[in-house]
Amino acid sequence: MKLPIIAVIGRPNVGKSTLVNRIAGDQQAIVHDQPGITRDRTYRPGFWQDRNFQIVDTGGIVFDDHEEFLPLIREQAAIALAEAAVALFVVDGQAGLNAADQEIADWLRQQNVPVVLAVNKCESLEQGYTQAAEFWELGMEEPFPISAIHGSGTGDLLDKVIEYLPTITDVEEDTTINVAIIGRPNVGKSSLLNALTGEQRAIVSPISGTTRDAIDTIIERNGQQYRLIDTAGIRRKKNVDYGAEFFSINRAFKAIRRADVVLFVIDVLDGVTEQDLKLAGRIIDEGRAVIIVANKWDAVEKDTYTINQYRKELQARLFFMEWAEMLFISAQTGQRVNKILDLVDQAAESHRRRVSTAVINEVIQEAVSWHSPPTSRQGKQGRIYYGTQVRSQPPTISLFVNDPKRFNDSYRRYIEKQFRQDLGFAGTPIRLVWRGKRVRDAERGTPNRATKV
């Protein structure tokens, strides 16, 4: 069941993201003293007085500045209000009431949503009520003095906010598939997000680095929900300034860890760059399922053999991801975008799958019968006693052997290939853990001696 939404609204640098982090209980929205850090709308789960909800952090609203992003930020805020049960209007108690606050208040009155006014940066109780008093002029009913940094006043504020939330009696088990959209700056991640959602969800601009936060949106298809996480483009370290962009890149890496499946977006015109390779390595290290999305295919001059040529070139560079599905798309025109979620379903199922020990050992027996383990120069042959899956996400199989050193890389790749081929693992890494075990211990630990190989 969809949770009710609280939209956080206000001008830049009044502490909206700090308040969202306070309510959500951890630091995920980027907090920095530079105005305009949050550009897109960012969804976070929240809980208060036995009530579950989502809280949406939006970009700072400005009406008298005509920079490129500002109309887009207002559009994102308007979309957040359209789906919200209540708006949380944040102002700066230290700066006091100003014309920008009044403009936002007038704009909010035009929206069909109740508003609760939070006067932030009130660091003491006595001063807080004095600072909040002048905001009665906005005509937004009672202003609540709070300190988002220290948490004072936020309890009373939330008590008021949840009065506007609809009651949810049943919350279904979360079977949502988390999908992180990852790639270098300006490869088309936000355009892909918009193509998947069918709306202008993230700010799209030809300027590299438009998206700063890892932002979430939920879509549903055939009863399956997907949480799409668009992230800041990841640059080379020497091109990263300490500050907002540094935090965004760390947030993107955290988004990879949150994901079940990563859409690894590559600019097909650039091919696989060194930064792409490093990013691919990070995805592999985190053990995420992957779909390689080769974007901007509409800009390539093609003939009958073009796609095969490009596929071979990309696979040669990403040889360590040979198990990942590769899709050539155009986020701009929508070409093949409709195939992405089918591949996501397949990869997520493989990533979460658990296989019985009996089946794993059948695969091992078959593999060994076709290709025996290598023999050392001293005439000692490797031997696999049995295997068992010890975890999923990614599938991890422990193989108990007489001596791990007797199994070279070639044979290990062969065994992994057999698991993929026989068990149908697609789009996910498989981790094989080779463990040494004495014969007697192996026989004692084998779940079924008939499966020994």
From Swiss-Prot:
GO aspect biological process, one term: ribosome biogenesis
InterPro entries: G_ENGA, GTP-bd, GTPase_Der, KH_dom-like, KH_dom-like_a/b, P-loop_NTPase, Small_GTP-bd
GO molecular function, one term: GTP binding
Keyword Nucleotide-binding: yes
Residues covered by the KH-like domain: 353-438
Binding site for GTP 2: 183-190, 230-234, 295-298
Domain named EngA-type G: residues: 4-169, 177-352
PROSITE patterns named in the record: G_ENGA
Keyword Nucleotide-binding recorded: yes
Keywords: GTP-binding, Nucleotide-binding, Repeat, Ribosome biogenesis
Binding, GTP 1: 10-17, 57-61, 120-123
Purpose: GTPase that plays an essential role in the late steps of ribosome biogenesis.
UniProt family annotation: Belongs to the TRAFAC class TrmE-Era-EngA-EngB-Septin-like GTPase superfamily. EngA (Der) GTPase family.
Subunit structure: Associates with the 50S ribosomal subunit.
Record-given protein name: GTPase Der
Lineage: Bacteria, Bacillati, Cyanobacteriota, Cyanophyceae, Oscillatoriophycideae
